Amino acid sequence: MQLSDRIIPTPQKLNVSEKTFALGSFGAVSYRIAQSKAHFSLEKATNRLKAELKERFGCEEKADASLVITLEGAEAPAGVKNPDQGYAIRAEEGKIVLSAFGEAGAYYAVTTLLQILKAEDGAFTLPAFDLLDYPDLQKRGHFVETRFGTDLMELEDWKQVVDAMVDVKENQLTVSVYGCWNMQYDKRISEYVFLPFKGYEDLKTPVYKKYYSPKKGDYVFDKVGTPMAEKDFFGELRAYGKERGVEVIPMFNSLGHNTLIPRLYPETSAKDENGNPANTGFCTAEPKTYEILFALYDQIIDRYSTPDNPIESFDIGMDEIRNEFAVDPADITHRHNAWCQCPICRNKSRQEIFFEHAAKLMKHLHSRGVKTVYMYNDMVVEHKTKLKPNPEDHSPLLKEALAKHGLLDVACVDWWAYNDVPEKLHFSDLHPELGFRSSIKPWNGYYHWSHVFHPIGNIYHMIKMAHASGAEAKRSYSSWDNSFHRPNQLQADWSWNWNGTGTMDDAKARYVRRHFPASIEAATKAFDLWDDITRQTNVQDPKNTLSNRREMIFSFLVYYRYSYYFDGRDYPRNYPGELVPKLRAEADFCAELREMQAQAEEAAKVFEEVAKANPDSAELAMRYRYEMMLYTAIFRDWTTLMDLDALAAKFSETKDEAIIAQMADLAKAQKNFRLEVIALLENTKEDYLIPSHARNQTIPMQYFADLEAYLKNTPAAELKLDLSDMRHMASETFMNLR
């Protein structure tokens, strides 16, 4: 592997000589570490270097070593961006010098050296080289949502997130600690609180585990608390991040995605036109709203801010403030308005309410020592929808409001969008001419509990916009699953070194060379298949599924989508029968399904071959194989249903009972395949991911188990075989899982 491919992210400047020098074999490297003076601390970097090299080389330092590794402070050369994070490395026979331009740069220099020092056949060899490196963007990291998976992460799991970010030189982890979504499972609103609050003990949310475990040989039905809230380890996580150069900051969604507080404290809720609590949003004319919000903010700052690690950044969210169904358990069919209609609020524009509210929150946080307050952009530059094809741009009003309250240096607008296609993004630049701070928020795929895809087009075009518009940060919208290793690493590359990382094809090829060097052609093929299965294209009709497969999968094929209430449809939804009329009517849709299934099956086989040929990355390749097995199972659900529907029609005509046996065998085969994939899940992924992933997989498995039992145990004359609605055969277990 060439030296540049070992370094993550892609370095800015690297000159490699043809000369090489040997360091020695494992257990026999003669080395010592020296430290020169610097105007900043080198302690963390030096301690890490000593500990890591002792393990890497398998031996202690020697006073008379033939290789001296020196860590020193230095002045950054002209033209270096973010110099406190920059560094240089010079390597030649007998010495390696790490010159850091700041404390963070020293830590990154060590990270790079450790990436370079890899043994081959038990021996360490290096070429002579000179490297100058620094990041294009000042802040680089992830916003990790309060959602499925994160609600079960222990402190050690969160530490692994920090470690993964350190490995790619990222320096900011935002943890969502309060957020709410619509009703989905268990006839409950999806609400999450990740911190305990004194005096507000009712602000806590349980986690329901409901799935079949092949490992246990039984169903799991349990209710537990969220570890971060129950064990109160957010402060420990912040300290762990601080020690490793990663700022860990809280996000508290403070207007949209907000149902728990207004439901429990109805005086704070947005009011409908009759003055009744809407159980969503806030009334910004109600003093109690700010009494509670400021009390919760203050507890976060007082408890988790320390003299050596103050909370200087805080995210208030403020996205997707809208009218929604299924945000009130008492009435899921009514559309509730998060914008207050009380006598005071109804006489203000939404922009006036929004900007006044944001300013109040920012001013309070700034008074508590917070220097940067992040806020989403979509209420500033509205997102394009079918109902609003030409949304309004309120960014000049934002500048006016920030300037009025002296917050231009405090507010940082977080620009987010999900589409891979640049023409379909909600904005084309970040309005640098207005002079407010901005960060970019691509996403990493997020929906790991349902299905994993890699939105590389979105990442590329969003970070391109960040560089063009002078954004200061990349703060990906994320959930954590190492199946997002590829998009996460490409984000790190493009936010560190835009020009050097190159095009999407360049970045994807480099990723394969880094991790699967023995199978470049095969790994490229597997990823190409994956990307084609989940492709997103620039089509006028987002439901043109033959072009836009990602929409096809998300809207029609995965169970997760059927967990939502949709206006005019039964709830719980008629799953999977709701899609059967489309399968009957659209031959092209069915043909596409079968092609996607064949592609997923092929990709799974290729990733298995890649794992065998690349032992250092075998675990990662097998994880990717699992994702392709899951896609195979998803597509097989529907191709099996198509075959069952054809047999049911044949039985209706012939009354041949042998057809029922065929149908039972098909249902059994798909049930067993689903069980195989759930077992693979349990052997592949971390414990905190299993319940949410397995639940979405157990539901289709249970459908086929119920169908098999129904076909085997019901007299043929009594069978009701309309696959568009088989709810009459649903077991209690099937309904409980939902």
Language-model region placement:
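Flexible loop/turn segments at secondary-structure boundaries
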Residues: 37-38, 150-152, 180-185, 255-261, ...
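Contiguous, structured surface segment used for ligand recognition
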Residues: 1-140
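Feature activates predominantly on carbohydrate-active enzymes
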Residues: 10, 82-347, 353, 440
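Structural motif
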Residues: 31-42, 70-75, 99-101, 145-146, ...
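A short, Lys/Arg-enriched amphipathic alpha-helix followed by its capping loop at the start of a domain
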Residues: 45, 49-52, 164, 168-170, ...
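A structural preference for short, hydrophobic beta-strand core positions in alpha/beta folds
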Residues: 61-63, 250, 375
